[in-house]
Curated annotation (Swiss-Prot):
It is found in: Nucleus. Residues 315-327, 371-382, 400-409 have a biased composition (Basic and acidic residues). PROSITE patterns: CCT, RESPONSE_REGULATORY. It comes from Arabidopsis thaliana (Mouse-ear cress). Residues 38-156 form the Response regulatory domain. Residues 168-177, 194-203, 328-364, 458-468 have a biased composition (Polar residues). This is Two-component response regulator-like APRR9.
Amino acid sequence: MGEIVVLSSDDGMETIKNRVKSSEVVQWEKYLPKTVLRVLLVESDYSTRQIITALLRKCCYKVVAVSDGLAAWEVLKEKSHNIDLILTELDLPSISGFALLALVMEHEACKNIPVIMMSSQDSIKMVLKCMLRGAADYLIKPMRKNELKNLWQHVWRRLTLRDDPTAHAQSLPASQHNLEDTDETCEDSRYHSDQGSGAQAINYNGHNKLMENGKSVDERDEFKETFDVTMDLIGGIDKRPDSIYKDKSRDECVGPELGLSLKRSCSVSFENQDESKHQKLSLSDASAFSRFEESKSAEKAVVALEESTSGEPKTPTESHEKLRKVTSDQGSATTSSNQENIGSSSVSFRNQVLQSTVTNQKQDSPIPVESNREKAASKEVEAGSQSTNEGIAGQSSSTEKPKEEESAKQRWSRSQREAALMKFRLKRKDRCFDKKVRYQSRKKLAEQRPRVKGQFVRTVNSDASTKS
C-alpha cells in the first residue's frame, strides 16, 4: 500500500493517487492468449444433451452436439483437425459407443483425439472394457461441473506426449499397465494349473524363480542341520545315564574287599543284573513320569515274587489280572514302598555277590574249610531273606492302611452330613410363619375393634342415637 500524506495543494493529491495505483497486483492472466477447446458431444437423449452443452459452454468449451454415433463419425471424418475431445455415451441408436471408440482408435487421423466415455452403468467390467479399448476416461452419470471443467487435462496430456515421444513410453496410463499384467497373470495361472497341481508356488519371472529356489534350498539345508544337531543332542542325553550307571555299577562290583579273584565273576555275571536293576528301579522320584515308573516296578517285583514262590512261570494275562489289585492299592503310599523295594534289592544284590564268592572259593579249594567269611555270608543271606519278608509285609500293611483311612473319612463325612440335615429339619419345625407384631397393645386394640368385611367400622354411642 502507498503512503497516505495529507497535503493542502492539488499536486499532493495527485501523488497519492499514483502511489496507490502502482501498489495494486497485476493480473497477468488477462494478457495471456486464451485457447478454446472444441468438444464433440454424442448423446441420444435431448434433455441431457442440452444440459451438458450448457455446462460445457459455461466452462469455456466450444461444443458440437450430435444425437447419433453415425453422425458423430461423419463429423470426425470431415473435421477431425477441428475437434480436440470426444465425449460420447455408451448406448447410442445406430452405432454404439464401443463401435465408435473402435473406429476412432483405428483411424490414423483420429487416434490421437482423447475419447471420454460416459454412462449411468457403474460396473467395473464396463469401465475395464472401455479402458482396454483405448478410452481416456470413464464418467458416471449424473456428471458434475468440476468433472467437465477438468476435461482439458486429457488434451494437455496428449499434446505433451505427442511433443516428447520418449516420455510417451514412460508415462503410459497406469491402469493400462495393470490391466495387461492381470491378463497375463490370469493366462499363466490357467496354463500352470492345467499342467500341474497348485500345491507348488509358481513364479512368472525367471529371476524370481531362481531366487526362491535358492532360498528353498538354503532353508532345507538349515532345517537339516538343526535336525541333525537335535538328534545328536537327544542321543547324547539318552546314552549318558546308561554309561554313568554302568561305570558306577562296575566300580561297586569290583571292590578291594572281594579281592582280585572276583573281578572276572563280577564283570561277566553281574552286567545283566545291573541292567535289570536299572530297568526295575526309578532313577529319580522328582521326574514327571515317576508315577508310571513306580507302577511298572511294582508289577515286575510282584511277578518275580510269585514265580519264585510257585516255581512255574505264569501267563501274562493271569499276572496282569492279579497285579491290577496290587497297583490300585499302592497309589497312596508310593514313597514307603519305593524305599523298601530299594532296600530289599540292595540286600539281595549283596547276598548274590557273597554267594558267588563262596562258590568260587569252594571250587578253588580241594578241602572243604568253613572260614569266618562263609559264616558271615550265611548270616547276611538269612538277614536278607528276613528283610525281604518284612518288606513284603510292610507293603501289604501299607496297602491296607489307605483303605482304612478312606473308609474312616467316608464315615465321618456321612455323619457330618446327617447331623446337618437333622439340624435343618429341627430349625424348619421351629419356624413361625405368623406376622411379627412390635407392640402387643396395638394388636389387642385392633382385635377388639369391630369389622365389616375385613375393614374397621366406627362405633356409634347409644345415647346419641336416642336423642336423634
